[in-house]
Structures are given as C-alpha cells and as structure tokens.
Amino acid sequence: PTYSVMKDQNKCNNMQHLSKRLNENGYSLQYIHGGDVDFTNQKGFLRSGNFIDIVRDTDFPITDRLSKWGVPDGIMFDYTLNLITSEETLSATQPYFKVLQTLSSHEPFDVPFHCLDDPYCNSAAYTDSCLGAFIDSLKVTPAWDNLLVMILPDHCYAKYPETMQNHELAHFRIPMVWTGGAIKSPRIISTIASQIDISATLLNQMGIDHDDFVFSKDIMDPMLPHFACYSFSDGFGFVTD
C-alpha cells in the first residue's frame, strides 16, 4: 500500500479528527511546525481538522531556518514553551490543544549539535535533548499543574540498525508517553495499539463522546480486542496481543 489519505482532500474532509472534536468541545487549536506545511497537502489535512492557527517555517526569520527542512527543533521547543507559559495563555479561560511537530531527526540529520558520530543517532539525541529541556522547563511553571503532554513518533528509522529491513515489525514499534501535572499516578501499559487508538483513549479520559470514531479503540479498556495494523511499500501487517 502506497496510498496516502492526507493527499486526498475529499477524504480528509469526511473523516473524524481528534482536533475537530476537541474544538467542538471548546478547545482552541494551534499547530506548530518548523517546516513546510504545504508539503504532501499537510495544510489541507490540518484545515479539515479545524486548525486555523498554523505556525510554519515562513513565520520565522531566514536566519532561524538552519536545516534542509526548516527551523531546528531547539528553536521550535523554545517557541512553544514561550507560548504555553505566556501571561496570555496562563490567564485564558479557554482550554487549548497545541501540537508541535518536530523535524530535526529526519534525513539528512543536519542539526546544530554533536555528541555521537552516527548522523541519525546524533539527530535523535539532539531532539531528545530539546524535548528534555522543554519538559524540565515546563515543570517549574504554573502551566504544569493542569497540563497533559503526549509524546510519540510516527515510526522508527528504517536504516538503524543498518540490518533492519523496511518490513520488519521493529520498524513500526514506537512508544507513547503521557506526562504532565494532569497525570494522577505513574503507569505502564503494554497493550498492542496504534496511533489511530489515541482519539478514543484520550477522549474517553476526558469524558467526551467518541462513538463515531469507529476505528479507534480505548487502549485502557481491557474488554476490547487490541490489535494494530501497519503497512509498507509492498505489503501490510497485523499484530495482536
């Protein structure tokens, strides 16, 4: 399978969006990315999810666009931190949903940072250091107490280790971390799931109806069948508990 739903605007307009459901329930929306949001119809996809406030590469001076893809993650994390901790945001009564999409760990891995010789590992270490500094800074602000931060990648890097093949299951195994003052207590969940299950899981925790998200399953519901699908250029896979 090589078809991309995001490139089909008609499908984008007629599918369920987590952001749209949150917006319908009173949340303001903002999408933050240091790259080109017109790439592969990303902007069209975001618009169909009710994102109007979209921050992109051209919103930053040319001196900040230091990589092939745009503005490095360090600058973007600092920008997002300033937004969340601003007096305007802290004093606002409307809840918000902000998405920060990173880009520095993408090929060609040209980051303003060096601690490892392997280019990919070095870029991942850079983004990780930026994320860690972001979380550490948030923890000492008033914003942290009621904040939920969700962290997840889209996929692993197919060329690390070098022996990994594009179809291998390990290429699609990714973590998801929830943190923030809104988390009541630590917990590890080993349920098989995929990104499509984020909507039902989050909305159920918030007490928001998600019955029309028919493909999404609540990861925390032990009574549901848990599985995940994945695809690559020449095939697809199915994983269960």
Question: Whereabouts are the PLM-identified features?
Answer:
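Solvent-exposed soluble domains appended to multi-pass membrane proteins
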Residues: P1-D241
